[in-house]
Amino acid sequence: MSRLRIYDDANHDTPVAVLEDHAAIADALGKVGVRFEQWEANQPIQPGASQDEVIAAYRSDIDRLMQENGYQAVDVISLKPDHPDRAAFRSKFLNEHTHSEDEVRFFVAGAGQFTLHINGQVYEVLCEKGDLIGVPDGTPHWFDMSVSPYFVAIRLFTNTEGWVAKFTGEDIAERFPRMDPHPSAANAS
């Protein structure tokens, strides 16, 4: 189940709000400029699927988003718990960073946790299958896939170079909860 926890950025122990209703999550995130939608993830895709398989399965949705928002590139990240580079992939995204473009992800399978640092608050968004999140350019955030990653996500970019981060140098990400492994990860290896 998708979830949003909102914290004061000085207090990582107790959230000031916890939301699990998609409409409530979308409303709360929309107020800070973050896009959050629930889509049908109805193609039979599992972590480990090839990029070509995933893109082919969702080609019409990808084309529509690219046309609506001017995205120039698309790729797929697909990880499961036995991926040999899972620790390196995880550490790449765990520190607070920004981008010069929106960060848009559609979760085709599994889950991942985006944590956004906006206006003195921390928005911890657990994205699951069917969730689309759009983090505006310049928004400080980090991403956790857990120690046992289990997800497939389509990534859309306006920059043809793909994922390019500017790290803030702040240690705030170290003070907030990490993502627990997805329940499906136990059976995925």
What residue spans do the PLM features occupy?
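Conserved metal-binding segment of the jelly-roll/cupin
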Residues: 127-147
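Short, conserved beta-strand element in jelly-roll/cupin
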Residues: 98-118
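A short secondary-structure junction signal
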Residues: 116-119, 124-126, 145-146, 165-167
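Conserved short histidine dyad/triad with adjacent acidic residue
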Residues: 75-100
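Double-stranded beta-helix
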Residues: 146-189
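Polybasic, positively charged surfaces/segments
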Residues: 72
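N-terminal leader/capping segments at the start of a protein or of a new domain
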Residues: 1-68
